[in-house]
Amino acid sequence: MSRFIGSTFKKSRRFGFSILETGKEFSKGKKRITTPGQHGKERAKVKVSEYGQQLQEKQKVKFMYGLSERQFRNTFAKAKKMQGILGTNFLVLLESRLDNIVYRLGFSATRQGARQLVNHGHILVNGKKVDIPSYLLSVGDLVEVKASMKKNEKVLEALQNNEATLEFVKVNKNEVKGEFVRLPERTELSSEISESLIVEWYNRLIKK
């Protein structure tokens, strides 16, 4: 787990964005202006092109949710087929993934850790084992850690340290289970994500 968190901290410093959405990656709650490394180098103030901004935003969100390029692009393609605002639909699909909801419920300190719980068959959805991290939950689905893992030290520690749960999920810490209550609203998700840049990035690729 420490290896995962260490890697996440480096990525957060690279993008100047809290991938864990807690701000703990930055000393004293302030974003560092140095690059990852033992001492770090002062980050040069270089004007980033429109292309560079789009690429950086895509990479930032991709790392945040822990997806491969193929998974990320396939999710975007699925969002394009939905009615409504494309960028918002894209984020809603990312949030509806089983590994993300396991993280949102506080069963793991990181999304990578949540993905491991799912991969190893430790998560039940509506009472049945689901070991596919990309599994898309439906509103009303019940998610819980299987009985043999409910006393697991890392799971309990993550639950204890979980400071806040977003309103689109409901958690019962005593029973180590929760519910995907409703789809998230855009205002509940990070304001530091500019999904319009990601839409522009993929639209650029489609035009080529």
From Swiss-Prot:
Domain S4 RNA-binding: 96-159
Gene3D superfamilies on file: Ribosomal Protein S4 Delta 41, Chain A, domain 1, RNA-binding S4 domain
Signal peptide: none
Keywords carried by this UniProt record: Ribonucleoprotein, Ribosomal protein, RNA-binding, rRNA-binding
Domain of life, per lineage: Bacteria
PROSITE patterns: RIBOSOMAL_S4, S4
SMART domains: Ribosomal_S4, S4
Keyword Transmembrane: no
GO molecular function: rRNA binding; structural constituent of ribosome
Assembly, per entry: Part of the 30S ribosomal subunit. Contacts protein S5. The interaction surface between S4 and S5 is involved in control of translational fidelity.
Name of protein: Small ribosomal subunit protein uS4
